[in-house]
Amino acid sequence: MLTTWLTEAKKIVIFTGAGMSTESGVPDFRSSRGLWQGKNPEALASVDAMDHNREAFIDFYRMRIEGLQGVRPHKGYDVLAAWEKELPITSIITQNTDGLHEQAGSEVVLPLHGSIQRLYCVACGQRYDVARYITNEPYCSCGGFIRPAVVLFGEMLNTDTLALAERHTKEADLFLVLGSSLVVSPANLFPKIAKECGAKLVIVNHDETPLDPLADLVIQDQSIGTFLEETNRALQA
């Protein structure tokens, strides 16, 4: 069924969440064993913390950046990167900030929440490598603070990214969700929009999601990497 939809679709949108990353070893902060368990995320990853509790802010993001060192995309990422060249994928909308899609070679990534793999100075805009946090050098030569290029609590999502994601979603005839609990707004609106505009909706996630009743196909309790590899083999058969 899915292979038929993939081959017949004119425009495909992939939507990925934390479940895509966890199979590469990236912690899922929304799970019971997640990154922020026991910590208040709004006290660590917020505009307020950046402005008024900077040491804790820096320590938190240093920990996250260091935790991504050595993490590599699993084979499912490679499948998606290959599909970009073989199938009409218009975008990979992701809730993740880890940059693993780009690392695997994907070129049509729309990171809704920004990227932790980029830093920039809030004063002059100069870009920096993440090594500046690892070596504890969070200030620019101009004196400005260097921050991760992620969307913090208290900030709005990038309007250009949102607009492009919405346009591609409305144009899609197949919308494939991979590893998202679909509980975070406004990201969880995209599958609804796709369905309302006539797309086939496929949800692949370890647990149930609130949008499962809308889906044309739901797959649970399966590794996303394995699912993508098996689907790819079926496409090549």
From Swiss-Prot:
The active site is at 113 (proton acceptor). Residues 1-237 form the Deacetylase sirtuin-type domain. PROSITE patterns: SIRTUIN. NAD(+) binds at residues 18, 22, 29-30, 95, 98, 113, 180-181, 205, 224. GO terms for cellular component: cytoplasm. Its EC number is 2.3.1.286. Nicotinamide binds at residues 29, 98. Binds 1 zinc ion per subunit. NAD-dependent protein deacetylase which modulates the activities of several enzymes which are inactive in their acetylated form. Belongs to the sirtuin family. Class U subfamily. This is NAD-dependent protein deacetylase. It comes from Halalkalibacterium halodurans (strain ATCC BAA-125 / DSM 18197 / FERM 7344 / JCM 9153 / C-125).
